[in-house]
């Protein structure tokens, strides 16, 4: 019988529901859990490295409303430090940005097909973001006034 996850959670372990995306900056690691949370709409956990002996984990974001991110999946850190997250759900798939205080902004919505955004990353030479449409075999290059979008 598969009881290990329940046994470990009872002993204080943090359960992850469908962990799919992982990225890091200088101080933390972010993990997306696509179907985590009370509504199964997703969570993002943040592991903070305080010292060599101490690491903390926090529930950084949990989707609780329809107008919030729905099933976070692939993730990256933007050159300006925001978290950029792709959705993976059966409805409308979007691309979101989150600042360090948890504020969000919508970057894009896939109205072309029902395919999810995947493999989001930034050029090392400028602020151009690249993202794939999974089932269409397309890679999009997105650039522009990021400061205006983040307001």
What are these regions (language model features)?
Residues 1-151:
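Sequence/structural signature of beta-propeller domains
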């Amino acid at each position: 019988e598969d009881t290990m996850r329940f046994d470990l959670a009872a002993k204080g372990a943090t359960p992850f529901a469908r962990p799919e995306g992982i990225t890091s900056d200088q101080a933390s690691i972010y993990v997306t859990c696509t179907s985590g949370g009370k509504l199964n709409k997703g969570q993002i956990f943040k592991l903070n490295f305080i010292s060599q002996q101490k690491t903390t984990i926090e529930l950084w974001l949990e989707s609780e409303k329809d107008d919030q991110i729905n099933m976070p999946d692939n993730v990256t850190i933007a050159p300006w430090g925001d978290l950029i997250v792709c959705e993976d759900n059966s409805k409308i798939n979007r691309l979101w940005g989150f600042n360090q205080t948890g504020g969000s902004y919508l970057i894009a919505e896939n109205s072309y097909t029902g395919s999810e955004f995947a493999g989001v990353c930034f050029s090392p030479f400028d602020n151009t973001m690249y993202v794939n449409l999974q089932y269409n075999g397309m890679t999009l290059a997105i650039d522009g006034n990021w400061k205006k979008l983040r307001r």
